[in-house]
């Protein structure tokens, strides 16, 4: 078994002083733009600090020298899709509830991709901005767990597989495979054989797990016309994919959407094309939300307590910050609530 790699070490003022050949007080004066050192020394100190990758500590800027702990959360998703995603709104609500009770801050940032997310972690680490992070949207071949372990940042992975991505990280997960199997069971019992899953972003661990489960359930039942199509989670792509499917030679009799926003857009697109829900096509949304009960027909949906999901993740991170061990915590399987948007298949098999 390979030896555990020591966390990367942040450069300090002592390192700068040693490299520049000056005292630590001179380094402090130079970096804080205070009088007491010559311009030549100030320039040399700043040059060395840049070479070493030094960044000022947020806590060091505060009068007391000891700031409250801060938790970081970076989301690499399209900003327009994220703004209407009820899952993240509820998840963050649960996270913030726990952090507020502990007087902890939340530093939140939206980025365009996982490379940018990794760059944020490196910057936060170098600047002492966060004491731990919550990692969302686990990915296939995910570079983030290894990076966070290298940096020595405590982390909790939200979602993903039951196996922790790294020994020092906690994982909070739900059984997406079991939830997908339950949806297929329900639709199959209603007579549906042409089922299409309008999935989220490709490469996300939960997206791939849902796709694999759907494929396995279809093979088990001998259903060749069951498939998944990936999207960016937006209403625009949800509607566009729905139109393309329903305008095809053999439209599906049931659609499973990976979030509520795409499901709503899909129902609207179906209506525009003259497909009634659930008469001509049944619809299931992966995430239940109040939106699912604000339209006619009310949407059948997979329901879970997403706020509690966020609370659990935040509690696990605070436990790590308190010196507790890494754990794997399973939350309840999302439960299918059958409403008005699913019904018996009326299309020819």
Protein language model features and the residues they cover:
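N-terminal helix-turn-helix DNA-binding module of bacterial transcription factors
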Residues: 1-69, 346-349
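Flexible loop/turn connectors
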Residues: 6, 226, 244, 248-349
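Amphipathic helical "hinge" segments at domain boundaries
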Residues: 54-120
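Hinge/beta->alpha junction and helix N-cap segments in small-molecule ligand-binding domains
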Residues: 78-90, 108-117, 172-182, 198-241, ...
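Short, well-structured alpha-helical segments in soluble
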Residues: 117-129, 239-249
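Flexible loop/hinge segments that line or gate small-molecule binding clefts
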Residues: 136-178, 261, 287-299
């Amino acid at each position: 078994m390979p030896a555990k790699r020591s966390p990367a070490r942040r450069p300090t003022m002592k390192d700068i002083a040693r490299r520049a050949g000056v005292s630590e007080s001179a380094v402090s004066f130079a970096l804080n733009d205070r009088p007491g050192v010559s311009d030549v020394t100030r320039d040399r100190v700043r040059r060395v600090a840049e070479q070493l990758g030094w960044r000022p500590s947020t806590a060091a800027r505060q009068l007391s020298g000891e700031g409250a702990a801060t938790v970081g959360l970076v989301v690499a998703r399209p900003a327009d899709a994220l703004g209407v995603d009820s899952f993240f709104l509820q998840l963050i609500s649960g996270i913030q509830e726990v952090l507020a009770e502990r007087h902890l801050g939340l530093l939140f940032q939206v980025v365009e991709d996982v490379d940018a997310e990794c760059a944020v972690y490196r910057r936060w680490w170098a600047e002492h901005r966060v004491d731990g992070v919550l990692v969302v949207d686990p990915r296939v071949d995910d570079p983030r767990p290894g990076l966070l372990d290298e940096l020595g940042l405590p982390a909790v992975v939200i979602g993903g597989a039951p196996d922790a991505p790294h020994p020092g990280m906690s994982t909070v997960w739900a059984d997406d495979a079991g939830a997908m199997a339950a949806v297929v069971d329900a639709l199959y019992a209603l007579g549906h054989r042409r089922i299409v899953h309008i999935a989220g972003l490709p490469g996300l661990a939960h997206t791939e797990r849902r796709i694999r489960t759907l494929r396995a359930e279809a093979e088990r039942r001998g259903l060749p016309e069951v498939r998944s199509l990936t999207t960016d989670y937006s209403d625009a792509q949800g509607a566009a994919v729905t139109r393309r499917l329903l305008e095809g030679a053999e439209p599906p009799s049931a659609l499973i959407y990976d979030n509520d926003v795409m499901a709503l857009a899909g129902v609207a697109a179906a209506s525009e094309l003259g497909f009634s829900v659930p008469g001509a096509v049944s619809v299931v949304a992966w995430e239940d939300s109040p939106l699912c009960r604000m339209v006619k027909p009310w949407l059948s949906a997979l329901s879970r307590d997403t706020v509690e999901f966020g609370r659990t993740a935040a509690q696990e991170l605070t436990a790590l910050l308190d010196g507790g061990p890494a754990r794997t915590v399973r939350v309840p399987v999302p439960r299918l609530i059958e409403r008005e948007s699913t019904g018996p298949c009326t299309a020819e098999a």
